[in-house]
């Protein structure tokens, strides 16, 4: 699909304005997957805070400046990248923030969830805002690239949402990026969490999960296939989650009679990593954009919006459930081409009224309303999410 898209270094992300605003108030922690665009966003923000200084813990010269606290006191914005790898990083940040020059802003970026690196030390409570940078969504591509919803979804299903493969004009370059990314991801980033001899097993797990998207995650089966314990399999999945590679969608069991599914379902942040047919890729894309929607509502509004699934003992299933606190707000079923809602979706729509119920369809001729269930085109419906 030929689209005239801006390159990844020149395009503002949808979060840019929000992060810029928060930098004037508190320390900002910006996390997200490797190559999701954090460094590019940081450098774009630096242009509005000149003079600014960027320091990366993985660069030896920068690491020395960080440990000696020898950065420029005149910098209006300090960017610390991958600082969570530093021992006692929370204590360091608290001291740096409390002792900063007047009016100096601070942005901390990292490719892992900060809460994963739990450690003793000073609390940052009350000093920071958190933002999570996701790959592109339908809405963000429309807002930043000026494409239609249909064009945006088609590109995301073809290339995934990471800036470089998504925005490049060359499909070959996108494929080369994907192959290298899948190889390097586990080999390089996982070493921050595990030992060298575990990397091969984690790579095998990563490859297995690419083929099990949307299925209940039975850790005992994975453990058996990999010849490891279930406890180790759980830890490995948690590592992949912490690096924003995969995420689990947990079952919603409140007020659902005969609820069965204890196992979560597994999805990838980047649909381009999924191995499966068009239906599986569409389901993963919807899951990833729903997670982005939830994280945006949490980060921007402080709302307790969460993503779940429902499956009962008769194996009736609703693909996705959005909840705010203890209240279901949305029921979402995903189909590639089937426009007819199931009896179970109708039943759950009545059960959770006034929650919105929708069947989003990838290839839909005509939107429709069947009782309380809306049948909507996937591209248009996804364009209406919060982010």
Describe the residue ranges of each PLM region.
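Conserved P-loop NTPase "ATPase switch" module shared by AAA+ and STAND
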Residues: 73-89
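Conserved ATPase-coupling elements of RecA-like P-loop NTPase cores
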Residues: 65, 84-93, 118-119
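Conserved alpha-helical scaffold flanking the Walker A/P-loop in AAA+ ATPase domains
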Residues: 61-78
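Interdomain hinge/linker elements that couple catalytic modules in large macromolecular machines
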Residues: 2-6, 132-312
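A cross-kingdom feature that marks ATP-driven nucleic-acid transaction machinery
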Residues: 1-35, 39-53, 57, 62, ...
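A short beta-strand-to-loop transition that corresponds to the Sensor-1 phosphate-sensing loop
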Residues: 109-114, 119, 135-136, 361-363
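Conserved catalytic/switch belt of AAA+ P-loop NTPases
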Residues: 90-114, 122
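Short regulatory helix/loop adjacent to the ATP-binding pocket of P-loop NTPases
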Residues: 114-129, 145-146
